Amino acid sequence: MVKKVFSFVWLITMAGTAAAEEAPDTIGRELDEVVVSGTAARQRLGDVRPGTERLELSTLKQLPSFGGENDIIRSLTLLPGVRSEGDGGGGFEVRGGSASQNLVLVDGITLYNPAHVMGIFSTFNDDALSSATLFKGAVPAMYGGASSSVLATQLAPGDMESYHGSFTVGLLAAKLKAEGPVVKDKLSFAVAARRSYVDAFLKMIPQYRSTVMNFYDVTARLRFIPSERNIVDGTFFISHDNMAVGNLMGMYWGNIGGSLNWLARSSDSFSVTSTLALTHFEPKMEMDIMDDDQVMRTYIHNYSLNERFRLALTDDHGLELGLRSELLRVRSAEWAQGASFEREIRSLWQNALWADYAGRFGEHFDVDLGVRLSVATVPTGRHFHDFHSNEGLQADFSGKTYFDVEPRAALKYALTSLHSIKAGVGMSTQNLHAIRSGMTSFPFDRYALTSASVKPEKSLQYSLGYAGMTYDGGFDWSAEVYYRDIDNVYDFKDGRSTFSDIMLENIILGGRGRSYGLELMARKNIGRLTGWISYTLSHTQTKIAGINDGRWYDATNDRRHDVTVTAIYRLSDSWSFSGSWIYLSGQPLTAPDVKYEIAGETCYYYSRRNAYLTPSTHRLDLSATYTHTGARFTYQWSFGLYNAYCRYNPTVVYFEDDPSKPSGTRAVQQSMYGLIPSVSYTLKF
């Protein structure tokens, strides 16, 4: 089943290519592009938390775009310790973690599988964003539920004084943005929408006229300022993908969410932020094979309430306290085939209290100390667990409560005004598990909630780093080492995959994981030519009793070497050029050791998990941008080459018979993208 799905994705994609917290008083900011040049060198040096990346706004096109889209996720992968899942995967992986171990937030709304059309675009419309911060090391105590990293993004509020807008038309998609006041200085709006039209090109090719591949997303934000000490924000987000080949197969998924945020200041030193948020993520797959209809559905429903209290004790010391209550309801699997119907739905209630203290002691020493107390309750009864199977299977729905204490700490010592040392330690707990059987994450991965038998995933990470810069900030550099130990990592049993059994506990096993590495980065910040070079050396392993004879084995997402080189050249006020080169060493792969025949069918025997490597991945992206700024209008032309030297990187590797080989078997690589040119036109008014 999984092989058919990957084959379908590869088919339609090849067809297509052939043809940190927003400042409360920030009002009316306009985003022209999100870039990962990082913060100013001085601010990077002064950040207390190691492994923190703040993505800045810029009015200049700087990084190569894909199809005319400046993508946050793709930009993140140019940083050390962060990498893409590869072609066909829309997620990002941080310090050996999988994409499902990241917490991705938009104005407090949790997003799942934040990707369009199998990773061609992310669900982030850059026109709508105001700011973004990635925590890959010491995560603040206010964030929980993710064992790897946190990406916190905020949408830009509408201008309270005047109306603005823009639209962009590219080869693959178009987008529109509008913002302005509803009631001047009191109520504003900002709306951004995007829609792809890959289908139009597919219909020009006779053999792909019945193929559907499109997506859309809409973001909207209202800001209301009833008084000088109160701000109320309402956010709405929806994204949806459609992929199908006639009546043979269809895949659909998307997020829909909303949040209401109220910031109240009782004084200049004390404020309270209340946030109510919800998310619905619902993938669906349909297949019609020889008149045999098959339907597979899953969903994740997330409802949360957050309270955050901030108190400035002095100019150099501050305290934050908060609480969070969250209800998760997950349909791990539901599929129907003919008269057969099976379904599994589970629920989990999470509550947390947290505290965070930040202080400065003299000119050299800064500290951030936090703790998070989390309680995960697995409720009992049919109201919280819905299980149905034609096979008459029974499940143990006994309840259980887990208590966890998650300490967090970050320290910075300034050796001089130009050099600093940072250290961090943090524990995180995750109760939503995604178990994948492919090389990348997938909208139809099996999701499991912590239960009486599936334990919470617990991560403990240590990090130590050094940062330095030149006196004028023209150059800065950093080095960081980390070690992460994880308990209760889950993987499929040998011979099992996503759709092997409706009862997830029957097909998975739990164990330990570990990841450690070195991250290096050097940047040039001044002059016509700017850019950065990053290198990551890392190793990620898993050890599970019952898999690989209980020995450590390389995790599916282990990539030993990761190199990125990014250059930006500003020829004039109108023209700028950029390029980025990315290299990733091979990905672990499970290959057969022996094959045999049963009733004329070839069967393979796998003795070791992930003992082989796929070929390495590398590509070069190039772009050129022309910008004209007028009195009332600004327009921009962007030209790009994705994968400029047309390297076919592996997306799926499988094995088949080949009598010409001494082993009688050969590995077959399928790739998604070759050289993809792009052009887009943007008008701002």
Stretches with model-predicted labels:
Residues S574, Y583-G600, P615-R619, T625-F685:
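C-terminal beta-signal and adjacent terminal beta-strands/loops
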Residues N302-N306, Q350-W354, L449-K455, Q461, ...:
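Outer membrane beta-barrel strand-and-loop segments of large Gram-negative receptors
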Residues Y483-D485, N506-D593:
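Gram-negative outer-membrane beta-barrel transporters
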